[in-house]
């Protein structure tokens, strides 16, 4: 690289370092998550022919899984859309809880909800976990050091069920505006790297919902929750992961 160009690049880096680093972090996380999802397609895809019963899919999550903010929530939340697309061989249930955290010490811990108990009793063959958005709230993220241990405990809990389910982790959706304490910085620099590292250590796939929903602010009327179109994109990403497409 010519010296003049190199110096201009270095100068630009120092002048815009925070923006530059944010872009680099997002890009690296997206690439890594995408690689994990691709690898999982080969090794963990669900083959309906391998099951002699209806395949039970538990969608564990927060308000985004629940479908908060969607006009026709009952029919357009992502687990319902996923179930319609997968067809009669699958039974997909929505175990989303608005405001829920993965953290056990969160202000509304998923561990303490009836939905967690119901998801356990469902004895799923497939578990899709999408928790982390509410964990970024300041009152919750003060327990950030506990996030990975609590996530691993949840993975181990579901993995020990009689059906021995296949488990997918999801990266959170983008945060287009800080609201209710939910913020993009903690998602990108806190949640996603932790999910990625944990998935690698546990040998589990990650569904990269962050990338799937990035650059689409029009699908987030309140800047946090996707609308029906966004929920459809989520369902498509989850289906592709489950079926190994």
Which residues are covered by each model-predicted region?
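Conserved SGNH/GDSL esterase-like catalytic core that processes O-acyl groups on lipids
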Residues: 50-58, 64-152, 176, 186
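Catalytic His-Asp segment of secreted/periplasmic serine-dependent ester chemistry enzymes
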Residues: 70, 108, 173-245
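Active-site segments of SGNH/GDSL-like serine hydrolases
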Residues: 130-134, 155-189
């Amino acid at each position: 690289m010519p010296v003049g160009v190199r110096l201009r690049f270095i100068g630009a880096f120092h002048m815009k370092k925070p923006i530059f680093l944010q872009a680099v972090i997002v890009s690296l996380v997206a690439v890594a998550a995408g690689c994990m999802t691709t690898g999982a397609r080969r090794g963990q895809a669900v083959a309906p022919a391998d099951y002699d019963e209806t395949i039970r899919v538990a969608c564990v999550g927060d308000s985004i899984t629940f479908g908060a903010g969607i006009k026709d929530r009952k029919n357009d939340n992502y687990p319902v859309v996923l179930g319609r697309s997968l067809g009669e061989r699958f039974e997909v249930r929505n175990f989303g809880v608005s405001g829920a955290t993965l953290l056990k010490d969160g202000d509304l811990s998923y561990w303490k909800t009836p939905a967690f108990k119901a998801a356990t009793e469902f004895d799923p063959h497939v578990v899709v976990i999408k928790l982390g958005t509410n964990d970024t709230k300041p009152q919750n993220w003060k327990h950030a050091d506990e996030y990975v241990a609590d996530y691993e405990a949840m993975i181990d809990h579901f993995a020990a069920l009689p059906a021995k389910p296949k488990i997918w982790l999801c990266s959170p959706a983008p945060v287009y505006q800080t609201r209710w304490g939910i913020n993009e910085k903690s998602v990108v620099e806190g949640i996603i790297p932790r999910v990625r590292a944990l998935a690698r250590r546990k040998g589990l796939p990650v569904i990269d919902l962050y990338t799937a929903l990035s650059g689409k602010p029009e699908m987030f009327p309140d800047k946090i929750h996707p609308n029906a179109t966004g929920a459809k994109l989520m369902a498509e990403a989850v289906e592709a992961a489950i079926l190994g497409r």
